[in-house]
């Protein structure tokens, strides 16, 4: 079994295509469950952000697994497979590992070095785990990716500029409005991106903030945080969006909705009086109706505009050191995986040896029924010691050999030499399949 990645991002597809492909939180469980119906896929995780959609899966066969995943995504997006393949990319085995490590490190982001993707990877894992779609392989892969991402950010200067999609958008808004200090802002969506936007708007010096969200409670919590920072903040639901639009100079929106939440009529009504209004539309799909950009006095900063901004590539100078860390960590991960794959074979061999020892001791009992208990115990200990010593060197060596590229052949040779039952090896591998969730994945 190997890891297969099927995805599309800002590097391979235009925004209109990414909008079709976007998989919202509500749809992710459906996609996961549909893909897992195939016997060719044993684990699956969906990573969907404002500029990428990627499915990571553990598959029994490359071509079969690719067909299952591709068809599931195509059906979700309402696209034909021929159209989808124009924009999709595929990574397998080592290349899939390297890609996820690069993504978690911010190396593949629209804004190189941004850190929000770490939380997005963590959320993708949590969703997959909650739907029993994660086994040992994706657990270890996700844990390693998060650790690598943190290491890159702590050991390199890749995020020294503090850039993110939000900061790039707000810099553009600042330029359009001749400054954000003293302005009134609205944040539509109180999730992680909305929280980040709120924090950056506060640092930019806004005076007033409207927090708009479907859930009034989440909006109130975010507004309370802003008030603690000295900003006059109010929380409203989406039903009252018009109140915020009527007052705001800049609107930052990222709701995760499947269709626009800000319509042409909403904005047209809010613009009465001839004022200027800047929208930072960070949603994928878009939160702001595209026709809004044609209104006088309106500026829409969307993902396509952000992608063209030179600031989004400013951190690339530090990418070399980050890439070296990723390469080193990929090698480390693959070594660990190869050793993990041979471990069930070694364990099955030791179990087989223990069974042989016990069978021979039973034969001894039949031949020497009068053997004293203490003497029998000493014989048993001696036999077990001999077997352990005989097995120690070859099992240690096979783990070492298996850790090198192409080392799976040594485990196969061990199974053949000792006639180990494949079902026994598989049972050993399955037992304790998923370790306890780690702090990396849940903090």
Swiss-Prot record:
One MF annotation (Gene Ontology) recorded for this entry: NADP binding
GO biological process: protoporphyrinogen IX biosynthetic process from glutamate
EC code(s) of this entry: 1.2.1.70
Binding residue positions for NADP(+): 189-194
Keywords, sorted A to Z: NADP, Oxidoreductase, Porphyrin biosynthesis
PROSITE patterns: GLUTR
Residues at the active site: 50 (nucleophile)
Positions with a binding annotation for substrate: 49-52, 109, 114-116, 120
Summary of subunit composition and partner proteins: Homodimer.
Protein family per UniProt: Belongs to the glutamyl-tRNA reductase family.
Function: Catalyzes the NADPH-dependent reduction of glutamyl-tRNA(Glu) to glutamate 1-semialdehyde (GSA).
Stated name of the protein: Glutamyl-tRNA reductase
Protein species of origin: Mycobacteroides abscessus (strain ATCC 19977 / DSM 44196 / CCUG 20993 / CIP 104536 / JCM 13569 / NCTC 13031 / TMC 1543 / L948) (Mycobacterium abscessus)
């Amino acid at each position: 079994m190997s890891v297969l990645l099927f995805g599309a991002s800002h590097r391979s597809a235009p925004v209109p295509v990414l909008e079709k492909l976007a998989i919202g939180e509500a749809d992710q469980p459906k996609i996961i469950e549909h893909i897992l119906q195939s016997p060719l896929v044993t684990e699956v995780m969906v990573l969907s952000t404002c500029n990428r959609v990627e499915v990571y899966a553990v598959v029994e066969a490359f071509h079969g697994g690719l067909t299952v995943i591709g068809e599931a995504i195509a059906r979700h997006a309402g696209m034909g497979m021929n159209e989808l393949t124009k924009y999709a990319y595929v990574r397998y085995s080592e290349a899939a590992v390297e890609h996820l490590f690069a993504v978690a490190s911010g190396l593949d982001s629209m804004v190189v070095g941004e850190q929000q993707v770490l939380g997005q990877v963590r959320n993708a894992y949590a969703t997959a785990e909650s739907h029993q779609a994660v086994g040992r392989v994706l657990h270890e892969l996700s844990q390693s990716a998060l650790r690598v991402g943190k290491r890159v950010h702590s050991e390199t200067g890749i995020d020294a500029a503090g850039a993110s999609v939000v900061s790039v958008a707000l810099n553009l808004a600042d330029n359009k409005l001749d400054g954000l200090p003293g302005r009134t802002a609205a944040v539509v969506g109180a999730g992680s991106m909305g929280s980040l936007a709120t924090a950056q708007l506060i640092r930019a010096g806004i005076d007033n903030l409207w927090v708009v969200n479907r859930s009034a409670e989440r909006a109130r919590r975010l507004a309370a945080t802003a008030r603690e920072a000295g900003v006059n903040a109010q929380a409203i639901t989406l039903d009252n969006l018009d109140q915020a639009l009527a007052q705001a100079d800049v609107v930052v929106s990222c709701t995760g909705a499947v269709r626009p939440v800000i319509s042409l009529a909403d904005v047209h009504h809010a613009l009465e009086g001839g004022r200027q209004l800047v929208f930072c539309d960070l949603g994928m799909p878009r939160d702001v109706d595209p026709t809004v950009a044609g209104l006088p006095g309106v500026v829409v900063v969307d993902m396509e505009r952000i992608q063209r901004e030179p600031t989004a590539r400013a951190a690339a100078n530090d990418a070399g050191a980050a890439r070296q860390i990723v390469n080193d960590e990929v090698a480390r991960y693959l070594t660990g995986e190869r050793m993990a794959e041979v471990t069930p074979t070694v364990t099955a061999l030791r179990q087989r040896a223990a069974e042989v020892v016990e069978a021979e001791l039973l034969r001894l009992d039949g031949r020497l029924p009068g053997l004293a208990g203490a003497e029998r115990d000493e014989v048993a200990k001696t036999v077990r010691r001999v077997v352990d010593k005989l097995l120690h060197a070859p099992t240690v060596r096979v783990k070492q050999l298996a850790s090198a590229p192409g080392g799976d052949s040594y485990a196969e040779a061990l199974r053949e030499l000792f006639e180990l039952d494949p079902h026994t090896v598989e049972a050993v591998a399955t037992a304790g399949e998923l370790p306890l969730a780690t702090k990396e994945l849940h903090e």
